[in-house]
UniProtKB/Swiss-Prot annotation:
Pfam families: GTP-bdg_M, GTP-bdg_N, MMR_HSR1. NCBIfam families: GTP_HflX. Its cofactor is Mg(2+). SUPFAM superfamilies: P-loop containing nucleoside triphosphate hydrolases. This is GTP-binding protein At3g49725, chloroplastic. The keyword Protease does not apply. GO terms for molecular function: GTP binding; metal ion binding. Belongs to the TRAFAC class OBG-HflX-like GTPase superfamily. HflX GTPase family. It is found in: Plastid, Chloroplast. In contrast to other GTP-binding proteins, this family is characterized by a circular permutation of the GTPase motifs described by a G4-G1-G3 pattern. Mg(2+) binds at residues 359, 379. Residues 346-585 form the Hflx-type G domain.
Length: 620
């Protein structure tokens, strides 16, 4: 102990004694708020605190004050450290910085595509994943900074699919150790260019797999569902779309509340990723108390964040219900106007796979400038436009959100209020991209989602299937004429050779003992993550049900082939819609026109006895 520190402590003792004796001998200072007993207790506690503070305790206290507190998105702002204090602290090795390196531009993702067979199907899935990665961009001042086709393709790598090798992927990292190291080498090469903000794995990962991959790669990791939610948040413009996108994010993030290693937790990625926080043993354990409880309520951090997410979800559902009520009133008003002065013949919902050309087709049929974009999920709100039919009537065409494969039912339920326009429509128009190599999968996905939201079977049987983009299909046929007959020979053999090579690399560490992982005995094991809540990371929660098989006997082919850009087949489509609406009107003869209702005068119903009693006796 230095002389200066000892002298300071001794001087504080003298000042404290003088103040105590002065207050004790002058009762005028002991007013109604402070009596002598409370004053003596205060002096005694102050002395004990001063004696316990040695120079080492002063240094320890200074270190604690200079440390950055544990970050929590739901913590109060007054406990948030300043930016200068955060920059002074060195970033831990396990922490992940999820902020884009260039805030003015869209996040740049690195795509990891599991290998699929046959190669044509792999190419289709790879193209869809690249479009998803490039679609993650938010509009600035009402428009995107660059055209979709002018953007560079994201860096990507095709790796071994663990589902093909075994019936079950690894429970800790999804991929084998050799594949994980291979991806890390690619990331290190891309980091030299400083072009990667996050890693997009085109598969559905559990919370533990996502956390372990983030720690190994030192990069944020987004799976297929997480990226789709981010795109929903970026493309939502109206109030209802933003509410539904936030609801989908909350339902997804509630299952991602798992504990991370490190006192600082980790930053988040995206608009609503802040719901993912340090959980379970949380704040009380990080403060050195050794317990897993917060305050005196006995509530863990995991339970606290779940309760807050549930409360927010209830508020969102109430606001969405108000918007749903408004749509219900609008639909009721449209139905009342059906048949009045030939105003409308009904409503037609245009459904289909994402980026199938639904908005472009509606713009061509209605001769309006509807918003169209090549990005996936460009339309999130239903938009009504009127189209004139050859019979002289006109119908309302409703543009809806596009569907996509491997989408859990939880996300479909988040957009239930918007998809009610599809259920309540008089006729369905299914738009199919004729250039898609996996066109049967697109058709099956759309039919499966329609069954999930409760579309009646009668509407599905009466649905019109339109194959769009036939102009691109003709261009592809012309290009195939000039292809070399020997081109492509041996590609499958090369893929099989690469597959065997990757299996050889991962053979030593491909299989993982699940009991060892759950007990936390392995090096990369995170079984302790499941100790607090096993249901939160249950893969069955976000498991995508099998797509319903399409009955080929019901659909022999498309009802009509069109090109929304060139206008080919649009007239034939309008005639087909007119015939369908006439058939629907003939099948519903009990519908009474509104003009006749106004001419009637309501009278209470009478039975036969009352009618007989009202007839005069001489006329019976």
């Amino acid at each position: 102990m230095s002389v200066t520190t000892s002298f300071g402590i001794w001087l504080n003792h003298i000042n404290l004694d003088n103040q105590a004796s002065f207050l004790y001998n002058n009762p005028h200072f002991c007013n109604r708020r402070f009596n002598r007993i409370s004053m003596l207790r205060t002096v005694s506690l102050a002395r004990n605190r001063l004696r316990s503070e040695t120079p080492s305790s002063f240094l320890a206290r200074d270190r604690l004050r200079s440390k950055t507190p544990s970050s929590s998105p739901f913590s109060s702002k007054r406990h948030t450290p300043k930016t200068s204090e955060i920059e002074e602290e060195s970033t831990p090795k396990d922490s992940v910085l999820l902020n884009p390196k260039d805030p003015s531009s869209a996040p740049k993702l690195f795509l990891v595509q599991p290998r699929l067979a046959p190669p044509k199907y792999l190419q289709a899935k790879l193209n869809e994943a690249l479009c998803l990665a490039n679609s993650l961009e938010e509009q600035r001042y009402g428009y995107f900074e660059s055209d979709f086709f002018d953007k560079e393709l994201p860096s990507h790598v095709v790796v071994q699919n663990p589902v093909r090798r075994s019936s079950k992927p690894r429970v800790d990292t999804y991929f084998g150790s050799g594949t994980v190291d291979n991806i890390k080498c690619h990331l290190n090469a891309e980091d030299s260019k400083e072009e990667v903000d996050a890693v997009f794995v085109n598969a559905i990962l559990t919370a533990i797999q996502q956390r372990n991959l983030e720690r190994i790669w030192a990069k944020p990791v987004l799976d297929r569902v997480g990226l789709i939610i981010e795109i929903f948040n970026a493309h939502a413009h109206t109030k209802e779309a933003k509410l539904q996108a936030e609801l989908a994010a909350l339902m997804y993030n509630k299952s991602r509340l798992v504990r991370v290693r490190g006192t600082d937790g980790r930053h988040t990625f995206g608009q609503f990723g802040e719901a993912e926080v340090v959980s379970a043993r949380g704040r009380a354990g990080s403060k050195g108390t050794g317990g897993g409880f917060v305050g005196g309520a006995g509530e863990t951090e995991l339970q606290l964040q779940r309760r807050r997410i549930s409360d927010r979800r209830i508020r969102l559902l109430s606001q969405i219900k108000e918007a749903q009520r408004t749509r219900l009133l609008q639909r009721a008003g449209r139905k009342k106007r059906v048949g009045l002065e030939g105003e409308s013949s009904g409503t037609i919902a245009v459904v289909g796979y994402t980026n199938a050309g639904k908005s472009t087709l509606i713009s061509a049929l209605t001769k309006t400038a509807l918003y169209c974009n090549e990005r996936l999920f460009a339309t999130l709100d239903p938009t009504l436009k009127s189209a004139h039919l050859p019979s002289g009537n006109f119908v309302l065409l409703s543009d809806t959100v596009g569907f996509i494969s491997d989408l859990p039912i939880q996300l479909v339920k988040a957009f239930q209020s918007t998809l009610e326009e599809v259920v309540e429509a008089d006729l369905l128009l299914h738009v199919v991209d004729s250039t898609a190599p996996n066109i049967e999968e697109h058709r099956s996905t759309v039919l499966h989602v329609l069954n999930q939201i409760g579309v009646p079977e009668e509407k599905l049987q009466n649905m019109i299937e339109v194959w769009n983009k036939i102009d691109y299909e003709e261009d592809e046929v012309e290009e195939e004429k000039y292809l070399d007959d020997g081109e492509g020979v041996g590609e499958e053999d090369e893929d099989e050779a690469d597959l065997k090579a990757e299996e050889t690399v991962d053979a030593s560490e491909a299989t993982v003992d699940e009991d060892q992982i759950q007990n936390g005995d392995g090096d990369d094991a995170d079984g302790w993550l499941l100790s607090e809540d096993e249901n939160a990371d249950d893969p069955e929660f976000w498991k995508v049900p099998e797509v319903a098989k399409v009955d080929a006997a019901n659909k022999k082919g498309p009802d009509v082939r069109v090109s929304a850009l060139t206008g080919v087949g649009l007239k034939e489509l309008l005639y087909l819609i007119d015939d369908k609406m006439k058939e629907k009107k003939l099948k519903s003869p009990t519908i009474v026109e509104r003009s006749e209702l106004h001419k009637r005068k309501w009278r209470p119903p009478r039975n036969d006895d009352e009618e007989e009693r009202l007839i005069p006796l001489d006329q019976r």
